[in-house]
Curated annotation (Swiss-Prot):
Compartment list: Plastid, Chloroplast
The organism of origin for this protein: Pisum sativum
GO CC, any one term: chloroplast
Entry protein name: 20 kDa chaperonin, chloroplastic
Taxonomic superkingdom: Eukaryota
Length: 21
């Protein structure tokens, strides 16, 4: 999800994977 939400990855790397799914 780094490409989808690069800002979210910096704030919540773990939640970033949840957003993708």
């Amino acid at each position: 999800a780094t490409v989808v939400a690069p800002k979210y990855t910096a704030i919540k790397p773990l939640g970033d994977r949840v957003l993708v799914k």
